[in-house]
């Protein structure tokens, strides 16, 4: 009887170890790739000028979210949210800034649900939701959290169920799971960090980007986080260098030898994109290929003027600033063919990564 129990325990332990190993997911080795011309690896499908919402035009995009055939453009200078179709057509304004219940004030983050039907806005006072088809206000909620004003990024799982990110956790988790007045830590870390992007949907799966000094992407499942993707760099920030407070963060931020963090990420069915703050305090791009397990890694070229903002099943999307595109860029001919030099409005770029196999 004792022998049988012992064998059962061994089997359970083995199964548990197998399950944990499976949760490690993909690892992309970025130490052997050094892309110096992204034009050799990117196929442009479309490059479309965005229609102006009015005579004031468009300012710089602080953030864009894409889903359900639509894009929300957060105009930082105008403090407004505009809805577009993914062919560049202006669809309307979403909400407005103000003091009423239906208006946002001091936007911190925006998040689109997995179906692309509802936009959520995190502002100084709570979480608002808007219908993507009409742009009309739907609801407002303020999670019952101490120090709610310290949360800067969020994701929506369902009504009253959110993940929230605090860059200065003061002993609590950087990422918490809040559901109808109750919450728990999902990721415990005492490091001071940037309020970079933290959450995005890939299909029906909610993805959670790692904290400052780490380089992985988790998925949220069954009330916890499971490792989905890990990126390997030749010069990751050492554990002892991770900033514990604002002063040490300022010092580490000035050091030029290390990869610091993942600033943003998105996915297609095959490819995983990450925007990484690398050495020399410069941004680098990673495109990891699920099919081959290989990664493309290289410096983001500022002369291309392209910012990757999202993905769907087959393609990535980016916002192109025509005035930043140099004559050496692979995008210059698209700009000349698609827009007026007298009125350089932002452009929506749809592209694929070329197969490397």
For the regions a protein language model found, what residue spans apply to each?
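Residue-level detector of Asp-centered blade-edge/turn motifs that repeat once per structural unit
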Residues: 66-68, 112-115, 156-159, 201-203, ...
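Asp-box/WD-like beta-propeller blade repeats and closely related beta-sheet repeat scaffolds
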Residues: 123-158, 164-168, 185-188
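Repeated scaffold domains used in trafficking and secretory/extracellular systems
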Residues: 60-63, 105-110, 147-156, 193-199, ...
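A short helix->beta-strand "capping" segment at the edge of beta-propeller domains
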Residues: 32-58
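Beta-strand-rich domains and repeat architectures in extracellular enzymes and scaffolds
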Residues: 48-79
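Conserved blade-ending motifs and adjacent loop-strand segments that build the rim/top face
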Residues: 234-248, 291-313
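Loop/turn-rich, solvent-exposed surfaces of beta-rich toroidal or solenoidal domains
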Residues: 252-296, 304-306
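Blade-loop segments of beta-propeller domains
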Residues: 51-56, 90-116, 145
């Amino acid at each position: 009887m004792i022998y049988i129990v012992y064998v059962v325990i061994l089997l359970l332990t083995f199964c548990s170890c197998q399950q944990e190993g499976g949760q490690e997911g993909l690892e992309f080795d970025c130490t052997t790739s050094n892309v110096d011309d992204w034009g050799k690896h990117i196929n442009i499908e479309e490059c479309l000028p965005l229609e102006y919402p009015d005579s004031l035009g468009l300012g710089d995009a602080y953030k864009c979210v894409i889903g359900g055939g639509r894009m929300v453009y957060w105009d930082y200078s105008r403090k407004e949210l505009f809805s577009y179709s993914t062919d560049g057509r202006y669809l309307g304004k979403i909400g407005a800034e103000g003091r009423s219940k239906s208006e946002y004030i001091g936007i911190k983050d925006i998040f689109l649900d997995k179906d692309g039907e509802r936009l959520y806005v995190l502002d100084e006072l709570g979480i608002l939701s808007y219908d993507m088809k009409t742009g009309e206000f739907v609801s407002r909620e303020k999670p019952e959290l101490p120090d709610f004003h310290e949360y800067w990024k969020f994701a929506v799982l369902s009504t009253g169920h959110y993940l929230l990110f605090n860059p200065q956790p003061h002993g609590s988790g950087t990422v918490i799971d809040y559901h109808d007045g109750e919450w728990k830590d999902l990721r415990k870390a005492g490091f001071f960090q940037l309020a970079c992007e933290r959450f995005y949907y890939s299909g029906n799966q909610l993805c959670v980007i790692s904290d400052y000094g780490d380089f992985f992407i988790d998925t949220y499942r069954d009330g916890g986080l499971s490792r989905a993707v890990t990126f390997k760099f030749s010069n990751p920030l050492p554990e002892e260098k991770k900033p514990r407070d604002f002063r040490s963060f300022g010092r580490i931020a000035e050091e030029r030898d290390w990869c610091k963090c993942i600033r943003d990420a998105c996915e297609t069915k095959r490819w995983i994109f990450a925007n990484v703050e690398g050495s020399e305090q410069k941004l680098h791009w990673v495109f990891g290929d699920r099919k081959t397990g290989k990664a493309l890694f290289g410096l983001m070229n500022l002369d291309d003027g392209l910012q990757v903002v999202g993905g769907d099943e087959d393609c990535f999307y980016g916002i192109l600033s025509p005035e930043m595109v140099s004559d050496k860029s692979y995008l210059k001919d698209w700009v000349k063919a698609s827009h007026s030099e007298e009125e350089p409005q932002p452009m929506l770029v749809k592209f694929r990564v070329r197969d490397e196999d």
